[in-house]
């Protein structure tokens, strides 16, 4: 039974990681209401809304830490078109992006799946990236290594002239420092704060719009959805449900996904019982090593030894 569950959990991980993998110069416009838009039907993503209008697409990100507020609004305008004179409030992004800076290894993998690796011109945290084509392009200096995502090399960022920066936002981060002053659209990828694996995966439709890969993104998500739901159905009646923990100890602290997180939902859908499912949050929680160790469990998932060695 344990081996069978490991297989299903691994399969679910693979399905998830397939994905998880300006002006006009990016300036904001004054606010007013628009009518007549076509809202995309998003079945799982709770923090994402996409509305298509004749001359632009409005993407609204709900603040996952305060769901009554908006995290960010983007107005996607095709590069081939003139920028409309009247737009609602939001950050204008000229699409498709062709010279992007990617902070997260997850989104590097995602762009590989979308066939958009040629749109990446810079990355951060190169030590965590496992995409051979990106590593080779960095070696050849075709892709810029901009250093740490926590403190990117601002001179390198300026030199590469990115048309968009994809990064993961954090609660109470205090902003993005000097990079915010470069007048480059910052795309806040809050997909990891969704409360289901399919909710996070559905953000691929947003990324498809950013990189001119809408059809590819829709097809990719449809395949992932079908595979995921099939796996979930295969294990829904398994009893007893084996216990599982995840992640690694960092220093004296063990960071674990909250009970409302994508990973917690993934384990539940895979037929397992996540031992910290009662932690009421979507992000990670910091626990003492002894607290985790004393729980005991049947299954344990973590980054590979190679990833751990290079992290």
Segments predicted by a language model, with ranges:
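Extracytoplasmic substrate-binding proteins
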Residues: 142, 153, 159-166, 172-253, ...
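Alpha-helical, coiled-coil/dimerization segments enriched in small aliphatic residues
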Residues: 258-259, 263-283
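Conserved small/polar residues in nucleotide/adenosyl-binding loops
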Residues: 300-305, 309
């Amino acid at each position: 039974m344990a081996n069978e569950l490991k297989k299903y959990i691994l399969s679910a991980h693979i399905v998830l990681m397939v994905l998880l993998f300006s002006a006009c110069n990016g300036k904001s416009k004054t606010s007013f209401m628009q009518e007549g838009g076509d809202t995309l039907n998003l079945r799982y993503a709770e923090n994402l809304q996409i509305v298509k209008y004749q001359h632009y697409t409005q993407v609204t990100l709900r603040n996952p830490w305060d769901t009554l507020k908006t995290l960010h609004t983007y107005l996607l305008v095709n590069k081939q078109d003139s920028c409309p004179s009247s737009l609602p409030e939001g950050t204008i992004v000229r699409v498709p992006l062709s010279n992007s800076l990617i902070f997260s290894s997850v989104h590097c993998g995602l762009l590989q799946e979308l066939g958009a690796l040629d749109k990446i011109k810079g990355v951060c945290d190169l030590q965590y990236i496992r995409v051979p084509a990106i590593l080779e392009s960095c070696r050849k200096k075709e892709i810029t290594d901009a250093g740490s995502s926590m403190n990117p090399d601002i001179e390198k960022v300026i030199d590469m002239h990115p048309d968009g920066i994809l990064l993961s936002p954090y609660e109470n981060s205090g902003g993005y420092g000097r990079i915010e002053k470069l007048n480059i659209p910052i795309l806040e990828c809050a997909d990891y704060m969704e409360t289901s694996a399919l909710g996070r995966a559905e953000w691929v439709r947003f990324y498809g719009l950013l990189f001119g890969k809408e059809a590819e993104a829709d097809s990719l998500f449809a395949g992932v959805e079908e595979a995921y739901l099939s796996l979930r159905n295969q294990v829904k009646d398994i009893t007893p449900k084996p216990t599982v923990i995840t992640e690694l100890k960092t220093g004296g602290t063990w960071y674990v996904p909250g009970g409302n997180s994508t990973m917690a939902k993934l384990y539940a859908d895979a037929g397992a019982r996540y031992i910290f499912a009662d932690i009421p949050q979507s992000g990670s929680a910091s626990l003492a090593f002894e607290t985790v160790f004393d729980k005991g469990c049947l299954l344990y998932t973590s980054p590979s030894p190679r990833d751990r060695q290079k992290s």
